[in-house]
């Protein structure tokens, strides 16, 4: 799961790990703020989320609910957005079920080998973390097939002072389509170059997951 990140002191993070049943979990998040306090809170939330997901084996919505409750129980004033995605094996042909939950974060995208781009959810999802621990969170499910790429990213990738987030997502989808077929590391690096156009205006994190094809397994 190659990933690229433009590193600054701030609150963006990503993570990837296996739950005990073998499902792969991919996370991206963004703590409000751009200082050492945000960086410290980011590390705390990252560890909490991983622990909750591993111990409980729960799906994305329940994991975010648990994290929200932990924030409330610790009486912190941390606010954050996050997407938790879980990839589960659907059959013996490499197809996977993708479940995800979104707490106020830019929506994930899926890139097909032919360049078609799907935006998962199309908006910023449910309420961000740290506001209301009783928030009920949606957990949509789709099927992803070998060769498709699941992309999670922080808002720093699509933000510009002279455009809206919707326009930024449209630019991202356009560049994804143009870069279809590249290896993951090259795709992430090219996206950063084309989207940021130099120095980023915000913290940026990006993670991409590509489902292996039969050819990938044969040559591995």
Model-assigned labels for residue ranges:
Residues 159:
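Short acidic/polar inter-strand loop motif in beta-rich domains
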Residues 56-60, 178-187:
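Short, charged, surface-exposed loops that flank catalytic or proteolytic processing sites
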Residues 1-150, 163, 190, 198-220:
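… and, occasionally, acidic/histidine-rich disordered N-termini of signaling adaptors
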Residues 49-53, 173-179:
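Short regulatory/linker helices and ligand/cofactor-binding micro-motifs at input modules
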Residues 155:
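Conserved catalytic-loop aspartate of Hanks-type protein kinases
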Residues 179-182, 194, 198:
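Hydrophobic alpha-helical segments
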Residues 145, 168, 172-177:
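Divalent-cation-assisted or electrostatically stabilized phosphate/pyrophosphate-binding catalytic cores
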Residues 171, 186-190:
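Exposed alpha-helical structural elements
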């Amino acid at each position: 799961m190659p990933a690229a990140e433009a590193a600054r002191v701030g609150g963006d993070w990503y993570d990837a790990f296996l739950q005990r049943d073998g499902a792969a979990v991919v996370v991206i998040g963004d703590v409000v703020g751009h200082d050492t306090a945000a960086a410290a809170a980011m590390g705390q939330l990252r560890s909490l989320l991983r622990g909750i997901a591993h111990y409980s084996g729960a799906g994305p919505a329940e994991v975010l609910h648990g994290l929200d409750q932990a924030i409330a129980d610790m009486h912190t004033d941390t606010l954050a957005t996050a997407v938790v995605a879980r990839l589960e094996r659907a059959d013996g042909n490499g197809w996977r079920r993708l479940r995800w939950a979104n707490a106020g974060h830019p929506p994930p995208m899926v890139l097909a080998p032919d360049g078609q781009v799907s935006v998962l959810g199309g908006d910023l999802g449910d309420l961000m973390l740290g506001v209301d621990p009783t928030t009920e969170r949606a957990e949509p499910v789709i099927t992803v097939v070998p060769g498709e790429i699941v992309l999670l990213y922080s808002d720093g990738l699509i933000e510009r002072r002279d455009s809206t987030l919707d326009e930024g997502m449209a630019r991202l989808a356009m560049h994804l389509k143009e870069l279809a077929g590249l290896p993951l590391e090259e795709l992430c690096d090219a996206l950063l170059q084309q989207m940021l156009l130099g120095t980023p205006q915000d913290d940026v994190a990006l993670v991409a997951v590509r489902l292996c094809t039969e050819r990938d397994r044969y040559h591995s």
